[in-house]
């Protein structure tokens, strides 16, 4: 029985992750999920009472390796704040490259379970990066600050770039606001912003996006429609 439940869960996740990436989170209905997965609606609801529970699984996978990518770009000789800046800049840029990813990230930052996962996942990283600026603060303090900076991130992701608000300005505005929260000195902020501006952040984020797609395809055993993917990333 447990094996059957595990196999049903695998089928559902495989279909859901593919559909979320190809057509968007909100455009994916429960009826479509159970039809394509070939499972009973009751079995689906027993495992995942809401779509939000599936999004939590996807969020855990997507956020798992983000800081690792950032650290490989902001090499170890640079202060930790550079890795934070690269990671958040990549995330903001990803949402400009693909509308379905934008929707997934915004939902993840909005829903109670997924946003709580993000707060908890990010808190330890923030303490490690900015701890010297807050010598008396605990992880609880960084958790509370993360609620605020995660709100900044969600708002900037939701506002699409245009000719009046280009990506470079969005990254600068977000990073300046976040670094001020974490007491990064103004002189250091200027150096961090100059470093980010020196990167081809769109090319880096595009590479990260395709690696993310490949990792999700491998983990959940599906193949994305190349047409749908390319239409979103032009």
Identify the function of each model-found stretch:
Residues 19, 65, 69, 94, ...:
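Short alpha-helical functional segments enriched in proximate histidine and acidic residues
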Residues 109-161, 165-176:
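Amphipathic alpha-helical packing segments from all-alpha helical-bundle domains
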Residues 102-107, 187-191:
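Short, hydrophobic secondary-structure boundary micro-motifs
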Residues 57, 68-103, 111, 119-123:
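Hydrophobic alpha-helical connector segments
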Residues 11, 19-53, 57:
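Helix-turn-helix
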Residues 128-132, 162-234:
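C-terminal peripheral helix-coil segments that are non-catalytic and often amphipathic
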């Amino acid at each position: 029985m447990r094996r059957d439940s595990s196999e049903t869960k695998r089928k559902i996740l495989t279909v859901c992750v593919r559909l979320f990436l190809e057509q968007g989170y909100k455009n994916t209905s429960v009826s479509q999920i159970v039809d394509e997965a070939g499972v009973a609606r009751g079995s689906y609801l027993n495992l995942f009472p809401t779509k939000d529970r599936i999004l939590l699984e996807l969020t855990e996978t997507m956020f798992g390796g983000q800081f690792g990518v950032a650290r490989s770009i902001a090499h170890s000789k640079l202060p930790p704040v550079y890795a934070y800046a690269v990671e958040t800049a990549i995330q903001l840029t990803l949402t400009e490259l693909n509308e379905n990813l934008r929707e997934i990230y915004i939902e993840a930052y909005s829903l109670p379970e997924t946003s709580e996962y993000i707060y908890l996942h990010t808190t330890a990283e923030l303490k490690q990066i900015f701890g010297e600026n807050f010598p008396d603060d605990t992880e609880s303090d960084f958790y509370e600050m993360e609620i605020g900076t995660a709100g900044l991130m969600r708002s900037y992701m939701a506002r699409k770039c245009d000719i009046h608000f280009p990506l470079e300005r969005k990254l600068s505005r977000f990073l300046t606001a976040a670094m001020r929260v974490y007491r990064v000195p103004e002189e250091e902020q200027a150096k961090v912003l100059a470093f980010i501006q020196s990167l081809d952040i769109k090319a880096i984020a595009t590479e990260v996006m395709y690696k993310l797609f490949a990792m999700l395809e491998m983990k959940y055993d599906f193949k994305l429609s190349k047409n749908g993917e390319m239409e979103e990333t032009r």
